[in-house]
Structure formats: structure tokens, C-alpha cells
Amino acid sequence: MTPFNRSIFVLFRLTVCAFLLTLLFHPSAGCSTIHAGQRADSSRSSPPEPRNNLQPSLTISPDSDEFSLNPELLERILEGPHGYFRFINTLFAEAVCARFQDDLGGIPKVNLYNDAHLENYAITERGRGLTDFDDATIGPMVLDLVRFGVSMHLTCRANGWEDKAEGMVDSFLSSYGAALKNPGLTIPPPEVVAQIRARFTTERERALAAKQKLMEPLGEPLENFEASFKQYTDQMKVQHPDLPSYFFDIKKAGRLKIGIGSALDEKYLLRVEGATKVDEDDVILEIKEVKDLRGISCILLRKAIPMRPIVMQARLAYEPYRYTGSIVIARSKGYEREKTFWVHEWYDNYHELSIRTSFQTPKDLHDIAADVGVQLGLGHPRNISDSESSGLRSTMVSTVERLQEQIEQAIADLTRQTVAAWHEFRREAISGKALDRQQVKHFLYDQGANPPSLPSKKGGKS
């Protein structure tokens, strides 16, 4: 059995088991698949499990190897609470599990994006919406609703629109409910999307060159990389038998070191031959390590199974990726544990929103919030239970109505806690434990930072 087929079989078996468990047990935030004394296979430590309904802290320390070895990551997190919020996704998700612990048995389990925030909204020449499905899984719908709500509050705060935040959340939840009630709902792209697309290049050489600049040295001979990549090319021969045999031949490969929440994950960019031997029709692929999610206790699919993000993106995306596949690298290749990766095409034009520069007016943010609400409202129940899809959507609508006050309170509380945790993180970093003298000067003077807050260009807080 090939690694790809084995992954499909494992995902099917886990999905069936998860369904049976939901019938037999009410999941609680206190449960975990990790036994006492064991650690999850993750580059970051798992958050403490909540006890007696106590929410885990959102505070992390800047005095760690994660930041000393990644000074650029530290700088991005210090820029404002939203960057910090992006980095602590596992801690944040577990905090939401804890807050809704007593209600989890009655909250539908859905296709969960599991890292919903505004800077994961991207525009391409083919589509728009939340992308980057590394954390996607099956779990309670409130995780996406609360996380995106906090992202909107932090974005309003950064732009000086705090008085608009609650209205943004209302728009998001209203659009979410509308999509649940009407699974055929479509809305036009927000005006921001059209403005960004107007700046896209149609010159392939320029687009390919820009992607190639992101490739950093592999650190190993390309031949070693190609040996593992063959797993993926074998899958593509089955999925796309009409493509020429050389379509996925590697022309250039490199490490990819961008992002905040995924900054510590292993990622690669590849330039492959494409449909002809002409450079202009080359294709860019991204290879990303599949995240281990065992630090989040109330979701159902926690292990790093490569088919998890592949299936979830097909259900959640407005426009699913092309050329999706997987690679499994065994311990014998020098890793401490088996590593799994998923692969997909990168578009020529790919623009992620920025909370500081993408929204010129509150209406811009309002429109994106509504668009994400529709995307999640359509994607959350998709293919979960086709024979009972109408009943599932109705249950989801009633759940949001029943828990709306609790959801809004969780958004408000976790926004405050995230900001407070970021201030503590920043104070500790500036005290000298994580920053050298030059970096301290940069954050205190060059950016105009004035503890405890960073003023934004629009007069709001960071």
C-alpha cells in the first residue's frame, strides 16, 4: 500500500471512529489523546490542560530558543497583539475549549478551519477567502467563530475603530447564519478584493521570479529531496494521467521561511517543469509540514495525517487548491519522528490581507467579515452528513442563537486577555531577556513605541 493510499485509509478509519465517539461520549475540554508523561510530537510545547473549568493562560515567554533562533519572528510578534495572537493559536484554541467545556456535547462538530483570522484571508487570480489549511480538522464550530471574532476586535483596535468592533462581529455571525440557512448562497467579492486584483501582474516571468526569490538554500543535495518527492509524483500520475511525464520535474527548490503561526513549521517551495519545456508555463508548488494538533483537546482529528488538510481545504475553500498530494518521510531519513507533508500549487498572484494596510475604511473590514462568514457557513457543514445536511445546518443555526451571548462574551474576554498577554510578552522582551540593545532602541524609538501600547498610523492602538 502506497503512503498516499495508507493516509486515505487512516483518515477514513479515524473519521469513522470520531463519528462513533460523538454518538457515545460528550467530548470535554479536559480530555486528551496524550497519556500522562507523554509529549505531543510538535515543535512547540502543548498548553496546560484546563482543570476545574479554568482557562489556560495565553502568556508565553520570549526567552526561548524559538525566538533567539528566529529574531525576525520575534520582531513581527512585537509589532502588535494580532501577531502574538497568530502565534499562540494552539493555546488560544485550548482556551476556547475550556470556556465552552460544559456546552461541547451540544455543539455540532464541523469542518473546522481552526485558525480563522483576517491575515489568513488571501486573494489570488482564481479565488479569495481563508486559505492556509494547516490547522484544519473536525471540531466544534465555536473555535472558528470566537477566533475570527477576536481577530476582528484586534484589527479594529489597531486601526482606531474600537467602537465598530461589535458591529463587525454581528455582520460576521449574521452572514454565517445566512449561509447555513441557504447552502446555495453566493455574494460578490468585496471591493477590497477587486482593488488588490487590479494590481496583480499578468507577466508569468515576473511572477515566477518573485516566488523563486523566496526560496532559501535546502541544506541538502537536491537528489535527496527528489527521492522523497517521488511519493508525490506517483500520486499525481494517478490523479492527472493526462499530464506529461515531466510535468513535476524539479527545476528549483528551496526552504520557505515566512509566516507567523507557521514560522516554525518546515516548508519548501518548488519550481517544476509544467505542461511544456518552456519556462513561462512552469508551476510553483508549496510543501508544508502537517501540524500536530494534540495540544487542542476538544477537536477530533489531532494527529499529523497528510490527508487532513487536503480533505478540509476541499470542503472549506471557495476555490480548492490544485495538485494536492502528500509526502511521508520516515525516521530513517534522520528525523526524530516520522514527518508528514502536504503539497499544493501556489498561484502566480497571492496576496494576504494585512490588518494595518489592507483596510482603508471600516466598510472594507465589514465586507471581508461578511465574506468570511459566508465561507465558513457554507464550508462548516459541507459533506459532514449529506443525507442529513438540512438537519445539521438547522442545528448549527439554533446553536449560534442559543450561544450567541456566550460567544460574544468569549470574544470580548479573550481579546482583552490576548492584549494583556502581548503586553507582558513585550515587556519581558524589551527588558533585555530576548532583545539586544539595538533591537530595544528600534522598538522604543524607531517605531514610536510607547509602553504599554503602540500607536498605529491611523491613530489607533496596536
PLM features: residue spans?
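Bacterial N-terminal signal peptides
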Residues: 13-27
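Short N-terminal edge-element motif at the start of the domain
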Residues: 232-247
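N-terminal secretory signal peptides that target proteins for export/translocation
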Residues: 1-10
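Signal peptide processing junction and immediate N-terminal pro/mature segment
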Residues: 24-40
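Long, low-complexity, intrinsically disordered segments
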Residues: 457-462
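Conserved ATP-binding subdomain of kinase catalytic cores across diverse folds
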Residues: 37-66, 79, 83-113, 118-195, ...
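Sequence-structural signature of the catalytic-core scaffold of metal-dependent phosphohydrolases
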Residues: 182-235
